Amino acid sequence: MTTAFYPGSFDPMTNGHLDVLVQALNVASKVIVAIGIHPGKTPLFSFDERAGLIRRSLSESLPQRAGDIAVVAFDNLVVDAARQHGASLLVRGLRDGTDLDYEMQMAGMNRQMAPDIQTLFLPAGTASRPITATLVRQIAAMGGNVSAFVPGPVFQALQAKHKA
């Protein structure tokens, strides 16, 4: 049984994240979606909100695999958190060459610190390549329609957040 660790801020989860998660489930029997907690950052959604949105999005999009996915928080090194959760794979999504350059550096450092944990790069699908959580937050804050970029529960939460 292979466990994959999929770290990110997921603020909010996008269709791009969901695309990578579906691919990861084709490789690993269990995927841990790991929300990074950074004390110096102020996310739009709290950890509990992000975890709930991810769980609701997954129950709608992947109901048959719900038992194969866990959502956790981490505030330490990715490789240490992955090891704590019994993961042997780190999942990283790639949208373009810029992502690849950055992720290759990170993979190299992670391999030095944890040679037992492999990094798995998964390319974003064509439709999700331009999507970033930052752009989704900005568009939603300006009243734009982001329904094509995020799962339904996330869209509803963004609408509620920006009407408040």
Swiss-Prot record:
Its EC number is 2.7.7.3. This is Phosphopantetheine adenylyltransferase. It is found in: Cytoplasm. GO terms for cellular component: cytoplasm. It comes from the Bacteria. Reversibly transfers an adenylyl group from ATP to 4'-phosphopantetheine, yielding dephospho-CoA (dPCoA) and pyrophosphate. Pathway: Cofactor biosynthesis; coenzyme A biosynthesis; CoA from (R)-pantothenate: step 4/5. The keyword Cytoplasm applies. GO terms for molecular function: ATP binding; pantetheine-phosphate adenylyltransferase activity. ATP binds at residues 9-10, 17, 93-95, 103, 128-134. GO terms for biological process: coenzyme A biosynthetic process. Keywords: ATP-binding, Coenzyme A biosynthesis, Cytoplasm, Magnesium, Nucleotide-binding, Nucleotidyltransferase, Transferase. Its cofactor is Mg(2+). PANTHER family: PHOSPHOPANTETHEINE ADENYLYLTRANSFERASE (PTHR21342:SF1). Gene3D superfamilies: HUPs. Homohexamer. The record marks 17 as: Transition state stabilizer. SUPFAM superfamilies: Nucleotidylyl transferase. Belongs to the bacterial CoaD family. Substrate binds at residues 9, 41, 78, 92. It catalyses: (R)-4'-phosphopantetheine + ATP + H(+) = 3'-dephospho-CoA + diphosphate.
